Amino acid sequence: MFMGEFRHSLDSKGRVIVPAKFRKGLGDNFVATRGLDNCIFVYPMNEWKVLEEKIRQLPLTKSDARAFSRFFLSGASECELDKQGRISLPSNLRDYAALQKDVVIIGVSNRVEIWSQEKWDNYQQQAESSFENIAEEIVDFDI
């Protein structure tokens, strides 16, 4: 399970250090793709295969299903860590997520997300103001 928030910098070659805490969970090969909210989703290969199968089951006759499949899968790239624990992010993903220099890498259960620091800070500020309302509407932890 991935959790936590880490701030790093993108180097001039489009590489970013993956937090040591996430490296083992991602494994040797993993997949990065366009995520929701203009961030990059990074999945360990086993999680990617589960997600890919679910996408494959979407009805081909539905235009929204085709659009989602195209968006999600066409942006996907198989990645690996270099010896320094960095991931080289393809330019199409860096452009999509508006990654410049400062990035935030967060753990979200079965995936890692990579955000531009500016977008993450804005998102977090908005989310904090509505967190309690969202929790009341969708979450029932029976606590």
From Swiss-Prot:
Highest taxon in the source lineage: Bacteria
Keywords: Cytoplasm, DNA-binding, Repeat, Transcription, Transcription regulation
A GO cellular component entry from the record: nucleoid
GO annotation (BP), single: negative regulation of DNA-templated transcription initiation
Alphabetical list of Gene3D superfamilies matching this protein: Transcriptional regulator MraZ domain
Gene Ontology MF terms: DNA-binding transcription factor activity; transcription cis-regulatory region binding
Domain SpoVT-AbrB: 5-47, 76-119
Subcellular location: Cytoplasm, Nucleoid
InterPro entries: MraZ (IPR003444), MraZ_C (IPR035644), MraZ_dom (IPR020603), MraZ_N (IPR035642), MraZ_sf (IPR038619), SpoVT-AbrB_dom (IPR007159), SpoVT-AbrB_sf (IPR037914)
Subunit structure: Forms oligomers.
HAMAP family for this protein: MraZ
Protein family per UniProt: Belongs to the MraZ family.
Protein name per its UniProtKB record: Transcriptional regulator MraZ
Organism: Natranaerobius thermophilus (strain ATCC BAA-1301 / DSM 18059 / JW/NM-WN-LF)
